[in-house]
Amino acid sequence: MIKWPWKSNETAPDALLPWDEALAIPVLASLSADEQSRLVQLADRFLQQKRLVPLQGFELDELKSARIALLFCLPVLELGIEWLDGFHEVLIYPAPFVVDDEWEDDIGLVHNQRVVQSGQSWQQGPIILNWLDIQDSFDASGFNLIVHEVAHKLDTRNGDRASGVPFIPLREVAGWEHDLHAAMNNIQDEIDLVGESAASIDAYAATDPAECFAVLSEYFFSAPELFAPRFPALWQRFCHFYQQDPMQRLRENAGYDGNASPQVH
């Protein structure tokens, strides 16, 4: 059990929530004791500020709420809870859900179709998730639905549409775009060679820059050993933006000893 070193002038997290049990998931295993305690404090504030809304009969309990909050706060552990401003509700379906999608093709024709979604994030509005994919986000596998949708929120924090470039200094934008597009091209080259199902990075990352940023944010936090050695320049930019280094954390706290893989600069 973790001993929470709360300062006397800080408000302790809700003791009724099962924080120790909530932390016991693989994606959080490499966090230090100090990082875990700070993450819990952020997650507690998240639950005070946001409303989790279960839909279609989904039953939300304290453990589920705590784990959802922890994953929401993982990307902003060093940025601060204010980076999650801009939405007040998280809607949670029991499973992937169907939505009406409208899109325009290259010649201007508008199409409507019903599509199955795992999650959605609106620039001004709630985040929509489903529990089946949230559960899959507990593993250190490279998939993390919550981190993906949070990344979209961070992407639009500058008030513009999602572009794959989060709120960073203007002088860093060109370099970020260069490295992000290099990663997209590399991922697409692998897809062309081995197919989507055999690609080592989720093929969704190659669809556009916004999705590349969101997908690679998933790998940044849940499978850094697949991201860092392959795209070292972009990895450093992610570390600078998130103010975290999950690869170093993995080495220090989980005894990782991986082999290097091809690099893209």
Curated annotation (Swiss-Prot):
SUPFAM superfamilies: Metalloproteases ('zincins'), catalytic domain
UniProt KW Signal keyword: no
Binding-site residues, Zn(2+): H111, H148, H152, E211
CDD domains referenced in this protein's UniProt entry, alphabetically: Peptidase_M90_mtfA (cd20169)
Cellular component terms per the entry's GO annotation: cytosol
Known EC number: 3.4.11.-
MF annotations from Gene Ontology: aminopeptidase activity; metallopeptidase activity; zinc ion binding
Alphabetically ordered keywords of this record: Aminopeptidase, Cytoplasm, Hydrolase, Metal-binding, Metalloprotease, Protease, Zinc
Names of required cofactors: Zn(2+)
Coiled coil (UniProt feature): none
Compartment(s) of residence: Cytoplasm
Keyword Amino-acid biosynthesis part of the UniProt annotation: no
Subunit relationships: Interacts with Mlc.
Family per similarity comment: Belongs to the MtfA family.
The protein's name in its UniProt record: Mlc titration factor A
Organism: Enterobacter sp. (strain 638)
Gene that encodes it: mtfA
